Every structure is written in C-alpha cells, then in structure tokens.
Curated annotation (Swiss-Prot):
This is GTP cyclohydrolase FolE2 2. It comes from Burkholderia cenocepacia (strain HI2424). Pfam families: GCHY-1 (PF02649). It catalyses: GTP + H2O = 7,8-dihydroneopterin 3'-triphosphate + formate + H(+). Converts GTP to 7,8-dihydroneopterin triphosphate. Keywords: Hydrolase. Its EC number is 3.5.4.16. PANTHER family: GTP CYCLOHYDROLASE MPTA (PTHR36445:SF1).
C-alpha cells in the first residue's frame, strides 16, 4: 500500500493541468464558477444554542478572463475548509476567507468571490408556563457573503415557524356562537350565570376559527465590522413580533396558554408581514420579509412579502 501511494505521489509531480495549458473554447468571461453543497462542520456562537452545526456550503469566484479555461476549485475547497478550524463564524472571518479566495485566483483575473452557508441553528426553548420544562427547536439559517473588489456584503436569512389564526374565520365563529346563544336564551328576561356557564361549556366551541402552522422567512444585512452574527437576537425579534411561535415541550397548562396567545393574536398573512417588518426596521439594515400561511381552509397557501419602502419587495 505504501509503495503504491509513493508511486502515485511521484507521478503527481508531472500530472497535467489542462485548466492552465488548454485554451478556453468560446473565450467568454463567466459571472460565477465554483461548487455547491459542500458538507462542512462550523461553529456558531449564539447564546442558548448548540455551537457545532453541520453546514452546506456553496462557494464561487468570478472568471472575467475569457482566455482562462477553468478556475482552481481545489484552492477554493481548501480555503473553505478553514471555516472548520473551530473558530466561530463572524463577518470578519468570512471576509478574510473571501479575500483569500480572490487572491488565490489572480491568474484568473478574479475580482469577486461569494459563499453561501446553510445550517440549522438548534436553540433551547422553555415552555410558556411549566417551570423546568424545555425543548430544542431548529431554525433554518442561510448566510450569504460576497466580496466584490473591496466591497464586502453579508446577509443573514432565518426561518421562524409560528401559528396563525384567521381573523375572518374567528369573526364568523363568534357570530355563529352569538346566534346560538340568542336562540337558547333570547326569550328569557334573566339568565343565571351557572346556566350560561353550562351552555358555554357545551357550545362555546360549536364553531372554531381555522388556524395553521405558518412560516416567516426574514433576511437582513449584517454589518461588515460586526463581531458576531446576532442570529438568535434576530429570531427572538421575529417571534416576539408574531406572538405565537410554535412550542417544543408542553403540558396542558402550556397548551392552554398557547391557545390564549392564538386567540389574542389573530392575523392575516398581511398582518404578519407588516408586524415583522415593523419590528426589524429600526434595528436591522435592509430587512426583507416573506410569510406563508399553510391554509387549513384551502389547498393553497396565503403569502405576503415586505421590504423597506425605498426598496423593491422582492423575495427573501
């Protein structure tokens, strides 16, 4: 085995590299070239979250030189692998890596590089009421870092799952119950509280509003000079704006508290998008919001987008 490896190593010294020696057919510049879906262990430093996460990375550089046949993907891979050295992800670290990628491709006249990281941030979440009860919730995260010349840009996208109850459906349900109550007691001049309580116990849920699991996908620009990513803070702000994030471990008291939260947080998809956008505008740069309610009434979803007033409302 050792002899075979030594022989292969000796042969490698003379291996051809056609990306350097062969001419590019067509002689056209390429906007981006690189790799997608690279498995990578990274460290994310967020309070109350698991530090070690499994990420999927996409990495590319531009190829403006029309005569160059191909880039050096192994160089990109090696530099990307440096993110797995145990240092927590940060804007400065991502910028250094992208700068090194550009520098490694000077022979390709490369001026720009970008990386996208996808992973789940696993956060510990406590129950609404029951003391000592908690569970883990995974939040999908996407980081997009780009270096174009000397300009570095970094955006973070998080997905938050919540419950939404339809205001229109709630109003129709209340109307039905109101009419049923009048049918039962409208002819009586005086009604005993115990009779009302007994009626409510049996009929208060004669009509229920439809609710559904929903998701908010939020994207914000992060400062290039930031020391941390601030992902959990962003997630917390979104959940607080919505008021009804899905729960992990619950007992009956927690489930009841969640029902109360839903009853006090009726929202259309438009309401959800506006709430989240308003909660982020004063704290985060260029927030963009996309919400989706997976309707239980319909076989289709309700969706809404929001962006800063000075920008177009494109998708996250």
């Amino acid at each position: 085995m050792e002899k075979a490896l030594h022989r292969i190593s000796s042969m490698n010294a003379a291996l051809p590299d056609i990306s350097l020696t062969d001419a590019a057919p067509g002689r056209r510049p390429l906007e981006w070239v690189g790799m997608q879906g690279i498995d990578l262990p990274v460290v994310v430093a967020e309070p109350g979250c698991r530090r070690d996460v499994h990420a999927r990375a996409d990495v590319q550089v531009d190829l403006p030189a029309p005569q160059v046949k191909g880039i050096h993907m192994s160089r990109l891979y090696g530099l990307l692998d440096g993110l797995a050295d145990g240092e927590a992800l940060s804007p400065a670290g991502l910028q250094r890596m992208l700068r090194a990628m550009v520098d490694s491709h000077r022979d390709c006249e490369t001026r720009s590089a970008r990386v996208r990281l996808r992973f789940d941030l696993l956060a510990r979440r406590t129950a609404l009421v029951t003391e000592g009860l908690a569970g883990w919730k995974a939040y999908p995260v996407r980081l997009d870092a780009t270096l174009a010349g000397d300009a570095f840009a970094l955006r973070a996208q998080v997905t938050v799952v919540y419950s939404s109850t339809c205001p229109c459906s709630a109003a129709l349900s209340r109307h039905w119950i109101e009419q049923a109550f009048l049918t039962a007691f409208g002819h009586e001049a005086r009604v005993e509280p115990t009779a009302v309580a007994a009626w409510l116990k049996r009929h208060a849920m004669a009509a229920t509003p439809h609710s559904q699991r929903s998701e908010a996908v939020v994207s914000v620009a992060l400062p290039a000079d930031g020391t941390t990513l601030g992902l959990l803070d962003l997630i917390d702000r979104v959940e607080q704006a919505l008021g009804t994030p899905v729960q992990t471990a619950v007992k009956r008291a927690d489930e009841q508290a969640f029902a109360v939260l839903n009853g006090g947080n009726l929202m259309f998809v438009e309401d959800a998008a506006r709430r989240v956008q308003a909660a982020l505008e004063d704290r985060h740069a260029s927030p963009r919001v996309r919400v989706r309610h997976l309707e239980s009434l319909h076989p289709h979803d309700a969706v809404a987008w929001a962006a800063p007033l000075r920008e177009g409302a494109d998708a996250c």
